[in-house]
């Protein structure tokens, strides 16, 4: 079962939803990078459960502990291990799931593939696994800040159950995003979006939507041709997230409806810098960043656990009715925002280190 992501900067996440804890081992982090538990904690706090009435009411502080890889507040260049204790695990709430497959969860597929599964909250398939990603992204972000200090990664909720926030990706700010519990940057229709979630919650249901992300201050040259294209690695990163079902960059599927004359991004000179007048490419051409804003969208399905009766089957093949129990998000989107940002940073720092290695090679050996 693969649990590692990255090439030069690698994370390996571990732990189960209702086990003793979850965490991450980070390998490939350069030495002498300032790093504290507070750097990690501020990102975990944005992801943790129980933040508001529209997130799961599981009460976890998600306190990060660095167990290895630092000394006197600096990275050593050795593996960094980060641990978060599960403080509010309630495995007994899932006793019924030992014999029943939850619809649209990983219960059946894990059992069919491995012949065993952790039925207490889904184990590794739980979104609690993303704590390791966010912690790893916090460390990756510190390295990225050192290599390319002008890079800024901002994600936000842009759509809830068909309702769009209608904000300008090029001008949205961190303050706009963090101004409300939904991480919805448009105050004008925030109330309508919240009502959509609350309506589903009252009916024992859930809703999905879209998280958008923009990266400003991108350098030219991140990404590798063919199989390690920047957008390909971003797609893998985002589609590996729990509940994610779609990824598009730049024009995305809209580009299929355009002509080449409409879709091409004309070049022009801004001083001594090559720029593009439009950005349908989303900041990537040939799998390599072109210096424009990196812009993409991630679609998330409705949370699969709902408080309504559903038809399913038992492990013995008997058709049964299930009303799910447990504490779950009516909408995963606000907590997905920092996770999307973390995975973006992990992809970028990995490619940044690869690019720095290339830049060590002289352009000419004459």
UniProtKB/Swiss-Prot annotation:
Q: Name one GO cellular component term.
A: cytosol
Q: In the Enzyme Commission scheme, what number(s) does this protein have? A: 4.2.3.5
Question: What is the required cofactor set for this protein?
Answer: FMNH2
The alphabetical list of record keywords is: Amino-acid biosynthesis, Aromatic amino acid biosynthesis, FAD, Flavoprotein, FMN, Lyase, NADP
* Positions annotated to bind FMN: 124-126, 286, 301-305, 327
GO biological process assignments: amino acid biosynthetic process; aromatic amino acid family biosynthetic process; chorismate biosynthetic process
This protein's pathway: Metabolic intermediate biosynthesis; chorismate biosynthesis; chorismate from D-erythrose 4-phosphate and phosphoenolpyruvate: step 7/7
Does the record bear Secreted in its keywords?
no
Gene Ontology MF term list: chorismate synthase activity; FMN binding
Which reaction equation describes what this protein catalyses?
A: 5-O-(1-carboxyvinyl)-3-phosphoshikimate = chorismate + phosphate
Cite the binding residues for NADP(+).
47
Q: Name one Pfam family in it.
A: Chorismate_synt
Q: Output the superkingdom of the source species.
A: Bacteria
Which NCBIfam families does the record match to this protein? Answer: aroC, PRK05382.1
Q: What does this protein do?
A: This reaction introduces a second double bond into the aromatic ring system.
How the protein assembles, per its UniProt entry? Homotetramer.
What the entry lists under HAMAP family is as follows:
Chorismate_synth
Family affiliation: Belongs to the chorismate synthase family.
Task: Indicate what this protein is called per its UniProt record.
Answer: Chorismate synthase
Q: Which organism is it from?
A: Methylacidiphilum infernorum (isolate V4) (Methylokorus infernorum (strain V4))
């Amino acid at each position: 079962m693969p649990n590692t992501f990255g090439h030069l900067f690698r994370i390996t996440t571990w732990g189960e939803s209702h086990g003793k804890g979850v965490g991450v081992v980070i390998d490939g982090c350069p030495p002498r990078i300032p790093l504290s538990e507070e750097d990690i904690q501020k990102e975990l706090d944005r992801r943790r459960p129980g933040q508001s009435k529209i997130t799961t009411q599981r009460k976890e502080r998600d306190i990060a502990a660095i167990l290895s890889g630092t000394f006197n507040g600096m990275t050593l260049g050795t593996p960094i291990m980060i641990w978060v204790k599960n403080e509010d695990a309630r495995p007994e709430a899932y006793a019924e799931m030992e014999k029943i497959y939850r619809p649209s969860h990983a219960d059946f597929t894990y059992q069919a593939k491995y012949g065993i599964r952790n039925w207490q909250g889904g184990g590794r398939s739980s979104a609690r696994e993303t704590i390791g990603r966010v912690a790893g992204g916090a460390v990756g972000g510190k390295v990225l800040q050192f290599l390319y200090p002008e890079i800024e990664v901002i994600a936000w909720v842009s759509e809830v159950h068909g309702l769009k926030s209608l904000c300008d990706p090029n001008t949205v700010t961190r303050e706009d995003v963090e101004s409300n519990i939904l991480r919805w940057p448009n105050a004008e229709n925030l109330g309508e979006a919240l009502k959509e979630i609350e309506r589903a919650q009252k009916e024992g249901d859930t809703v999905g939507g879209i998280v958008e992300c923009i990266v400003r201050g991108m350098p030219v040259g991140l990404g590798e041709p063919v199989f390690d294209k920047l957008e390909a690695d971003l797609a893998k990163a985002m589609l590996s997230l729990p509940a994610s079902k779609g990824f598009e960059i730049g024009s995305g599927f809209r580009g299929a409806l355009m002509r080449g004359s409409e879709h091409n991004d004309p070049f022009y000179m801004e001083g001594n810098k090559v720029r593009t007048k439009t950005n349908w490419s989303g900041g990537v051409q040939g799998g390599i960043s072109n210096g424009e804003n990196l812009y993409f969208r991630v679609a998330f399905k409705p949370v699969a656990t709902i408080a309504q009766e559903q038809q399913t089957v038992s492990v013995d093949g008997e058709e049964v009715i299930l009303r799910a129990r447990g504490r779950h998000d009516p909408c995963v989107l606000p907590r997905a925002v920092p996770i999307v940002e973390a995975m973006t940073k992990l992809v970028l720092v990995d490619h940044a280190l690869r690019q720095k290695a290339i830049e060590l090679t002289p352009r000419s050996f004459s």
